[in-house]
Amino acid sequence: RGTPQPPPRLRSLSIRGCAPGPPHVPCVAVLCMEGENTALWTQCGSDTSYQLLDGQGPWRLVSVPNSTSFALHDHRGDVTLFSPTLKPTPLDPLLSFCPTLHILPAEHEGTWQASRRTADGSLLAAHRVLAIVATSFTCTDHLLIWTTHAHEAMFVPLTCLTTTPQVSQLSRRVERGSRIVTAVPSAMSLVLQMPRGNLETTYPRPMVLDVIRDRLDRLAFGEALRVSRAHRVDLNLLHDHCPTAFLERVPEILAQIHHVDHINLLLSNLRNEDVTQSLYRPWDASTRAPMAHLDTKVNQICDRFLEAMQAADERYYLSSILTAHVRKVPADYESGLRVLLKYMHTDMALAEEACKYIIFLVNADQLYHVALGMYDFELALLIAQQSPRDPREYVPFLREMRAKEPLAYQRFCMDDYLGRHAKALAWLAQAGSEHTEAAMTYMVQHKLFREGLVAWAKDWLFYPSP
């Protein structure tokens, strides 16, 4: 509103969004007809200019990546760069007008060059050959994309045009004869036209990863997670892209993600692997050093999340806390069951729901044995009730175990059932003198002589009289 309107007969339009820095100033450039002549109308904020161009054309406006600038390409092949803050700057001229022209970064920072595709399929930037046998091309603010006669779409970062790192090209197969129409970086999509004329939208992995890495660099972990879920990207990338920043901001990550199901998904996908060295290698592999302490990666992340969730709201994050315990390497089932045990005494309904969830994560028989190893019959009964176990099997067993006395003998029977013979011997040694002979036999049977010496080390009955 209140913006001067350009003449109605448009030829070409370039909208470059907002000038950098506050206040955000929209910049627009329009080619329009003025009688038999062509005029260039530009506006950046409140500054408006209007000038007639020399010649009949053709003319073309070209956007400049990562900039509010634009370029004007005329019928003679000349390319002129226009900027809201600088005077018009001529670039290296082309031999003739080129309908497929893009402006790319040049070798020196802050300079630009015109790129084009020649009749023989060569992709050129000024006089430098970027690719051969290219059938179409385009660029985004970060990527140069082209298709080849081998029916592949190729992707390289624009930074390779200003520096000479050993970057790797990424590619994906496309349908035979596909041509690029446009790339939409915000949607992570590449629009292709098929030989039969129809348009198809694809979501190439390089464009998706480019957006995810950008979100992670801006510490927008919640957005990065949503994009990763939508495009089935390994969630380990959220940590592996920058481990230090991730571990230092776990409370912030919880606030951004918030939904416990998404937190559970993130924790469940953790593994001791650096995906930036395997699945999603960076453009320049030399910039990435091997991750330190890779074998403890999962445990470090789980510990940080446990600390943050327990401090924030343990009840709300209960399922995520259980997930963090069982995802450790090795899994810490006992700590997870202790959390469950705490809620059994305060909120049985919540404890039952949590029990169903942890059984979903872990084999029920394994959890049942862990609960028995904790010598808690109520916990073992709860797990057995939520599992497919037959009550005719576990109810008499638990009743029999609970009836054994004294407590040390009861725990001996439990550990013996679980195959923990060293612990069983220690309990049997404490069960009283009436079980001493049985303990000796048990020690010999399982060859636990060292454990026997420890168990009876302070019992004077086993020492000779002076």
Which residues does each PLM region occupy?
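Extended alpha-helical solenoid/arm regions of large eukaryotic scaffolding proteins
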Residues: 1-466
